């Protein structure tokens, strides 16, 4: 009977790092027993030095990281500062800080570190063994202190933070000089999708909601996002809305959006003549049959009640 070898996996740079359970547990016990010489020898014999050091990075065990890299003469900045990038990827703050203090290139791999850190969720979960969580804001601040934003596309960093729903990171980036004006419509659309508070913050910082011919208002209306009132208050021009934008809001039963437009004086008469633009023969045939036989109010009620317009269109 063959014993199945369970394996601990963790991934980085599309490379799977693994330690078979018996090796993994053996190495850990040697570490616990402070039998460092034997540990280093066994890791070398099994060609697992890099793998075990990587594991220490993942769990942010700085003391043993320093000890093992020193005893095994491991160069800590090899492979484009791989351990540093791994530390950032796993939010291993202590090791990331140590590596920066000892010469890690904060801009390595096209500013990987600050881009990665800006895109973390509210909390990034460590390796399951430690069952630990830490807010990632401190890591972002650390990287900024080491000039990670210098020479970087900071507008893209803000966009990354918005996509991660991180108002706190957006604020830190902006407070440290991040650009929010070179691609305003992109940032606004992302904020519309992910976080009303971020949208409100960007507006408070002077971002122009009319950028790109009010494209963010068209985006919000046509996809049913409940921030139209905020955009209008900030100066968005609803007269730029197309017939298609409003019709999509109607089909999605966006009653709040339609009500907001109505309260702000939007002229829904632009929808008159919409039937003349329909080129689908099946739709035209139905309209012709129903015309003068069924009230348009009832036709609209039937269509809206039975509308299966993609509720997941907002993505």
UniProtKB/Swiss-Prot annotation:
Keywords: ANK repeat, Repeat. The keyword Repeat applies. InterPro entries: Ankyrin_rpt (IPR002110), Ankyrin_rpt-contain_sf (IPR036770). The keyword ATP-binding does not apply. ANK repeats lie at residues 79-108, 118-152, 153-182, 184-211, 212-240. PROSITE patterns: ANK_REP_REGION, ANK_REPEAT. This is Putative ankyrin repeat protein R600. It comes from Acanthamoeba polyphaga mimivirus.
């Amino acid at each position: 009977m063959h014993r199945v070898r369970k394996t601990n996996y963790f991934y980085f740079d599309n490379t799977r790092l693994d330690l078979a359970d018996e090796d993994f547990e053996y190495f850990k016990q040697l570490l616990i027993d402070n039998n460092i010489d034997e540990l280093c020898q066994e890791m070398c014999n099994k060609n697992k030095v890099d793998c075990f050091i990587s594991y220490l990075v993942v769990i942010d065990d700085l003391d043993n990281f320093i000890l093992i890299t020193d005893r095994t003469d491991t160069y800590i900045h090899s492979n484009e500062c791989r351990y540093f990038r791994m530390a950032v990827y796993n939010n291993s703050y202590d090791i990331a800080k140590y590596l920066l203090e000892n010469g890690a290139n904060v801009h390595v791999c096209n500013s990987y570190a600050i881009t990665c850190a800006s895109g973390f969720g509210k909390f990034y979960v460590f390796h399951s063994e430690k069952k630990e969580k830490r807010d990632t804001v401190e890591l972002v601040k650390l990287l900024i202190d080491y000039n990670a934003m210098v020479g970087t596309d900071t507008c893209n960093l803000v966009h990354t933070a918005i996509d991660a729903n991180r108002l706190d990171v957006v604020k830190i980036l902006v407070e440290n000089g991040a650009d929010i004006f070179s691609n305003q419509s992109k940032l606004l659309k992302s904020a519309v999708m992910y976080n009303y508070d971020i949208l409100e913050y960007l507006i408070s910082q002077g971002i122009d909601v009319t950028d790109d011919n009010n494209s963010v208002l068209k985006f919000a209306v046509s996809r049913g996002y409940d921030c139209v009132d905020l955009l209008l208050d900030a100066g968005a021009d609803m007269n730029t809305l197309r017939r298609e934008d409003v019709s999509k809001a109607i089909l999605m039963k966006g009653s709040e959006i339609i009500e907001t437009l109505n309260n702000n004086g939007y002229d829904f008469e632009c929808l008159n003549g919409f039937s003349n633009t329909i080129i689908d023969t099946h739709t035209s045939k139905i309209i012709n049959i129903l015309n003068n036989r069924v009230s348009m109010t009832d036709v609209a009620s039937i269509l809206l009640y039975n509308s299966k317009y993609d509720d997941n269109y907002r993505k």
